[in-house]
A protein has these predicted regions:
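Long, K/E/R/D-enriched contiguous segments that form extended
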Residues: 1-73
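Catalytic binding pocket for nucleotide-activated donors in carbohydrate/polymer assembly enzymes
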Residues: 77-79, 85-256
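Short, flexible loop segments at the rims of nucleotide/cofactor-binding pockets, characterized by
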Residues: 60-62, 84-87
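Serine residues within intrinsically disordered or low-complexity segments
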Residues: 272-274
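Amphipathic, well-packed alpha-helical segments that form the structural scaffold of globular domains
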Residues: 1-5, 43, 47, 80, ...
């Protein structure tokens, strides 16, 4: 939503922004009301963005229902950027980021879980790292943290959060969006306000997320190759260089297609697994 506003208002350069399709894939347990609220919000956002002729040539949003292995087998090999955005110190590890990395995807994420090892092996300069580190999160938990102070200081964050309750989107009268809003600003159940420190990382996350979409394609190729080199060091699979060549071929094809006016790349986001990918 912040990117949508940025494009609409000129804060994000349309000339530098790569046309992007955001694919969200998730599923919610029958009684998981908050997860259902997030999915509803994604679909409302899709309706807003896709129905706006002013921006839908630059960005679109699609929700993939019941995301599963069959979808992953198609999406993961195509990914250019894998988002792994769990709050630092909250996720022991995961395998999604490894699967994306094994297919040449650059990681955009926090220093958490296996992201740390990926950054160490491929080089932090070849990833898009943002957000508070685990020691800062621990300090905020100890000394106190006020997300409302962050919202007061960051109009962009406030505008996005307020969209939950200001009429921008409708939850059909279920109250799910207000529950999400309350969880961020007042606290819900046994959690304090913004339990996962989302507002602390919000602006850094949005700004980091725009970097892969800028017109620095040559630099991005180098980052992709670094992921492939990491695979050879860790797994000793000599044929991985062929995968890298195929991935770079997709990047080159994207460049050629873009020169001819094609609208090609897409991003994939799994909220339940804290992962998003930008597919070319």
């Amino acid at each position: 939503l912040d990117t949508y506003y940025g494009l609409k208002e000129g804060r994000i350069s349309r000339a530098d922004f790569a046309p992007t399709v955001y694919l969200f894939g998730a599923k919610a347990a029958p009684g998981y009301v908050r997860a259902k609220g997030i999915i509803k919000y994604i679909n409302e956002l899709a309706e807003l963005v896709n129905g706006d002729a002013d921006v839908n040539g630059l960005m679109q949003v699609v929700f993939v229902q019941n995301y599963n292995v069959s979808y992953a087998e198609k999406i993961i090999p195509a990914a250019d950027v894998s988002e792994q955005i769990s709050t630092a110190g909250t996720e022991a590890s995961g395998t999604s980021n490894m699967k994306f990395m094994l297919n040449g995807a650059v990681t955009l994420g926090t220093l958490d879980g296996a992201n740390i090892e990926i950054a160490e092996q491929a080089g932090a300069e070849n990833e898009y790292i943002f957000g508070a580190r685990a020691d800062e999160i621990a300090r905020l938990q100890k000394d106190g943290y006020d997300p409302n102070a962050v919202l007061a200081a960051e109009p962009r964050a406030k505008r996005v959060v307020e969209s939950l309750v200001d009429g921008t989107f409708s939850d059909g009268g279920t109250g799910m969006f207000r529950e999400l809003y309350v969880s961020l600003t007042e606290g819900a159940s046994w959690h304090k306000p913004d339990h996962y420190f989302l507002m602390r990382d919000f602006i850094e996350y949005c700004d980091a997320g725009c970097q892969p979409g800028l017109s620095r394609r040559a630099g991005f190729r180098g980052k992709v190759c670094a992921q492939c080199g990491k695979r050879r060091r860790v797994f000793v699979r000599p044929y991985d260089s062929g995968i890298c060549a195929g991935h770079l071929a997709r990047v080159n094809a994207w460049d050629k297609a873009k020169r001819h006016g094609a609208k090609v790349p897409c991003r994939f986001f799994m909220p339940s697994a804290s992962a998003r990918a930008w597919c070319g």
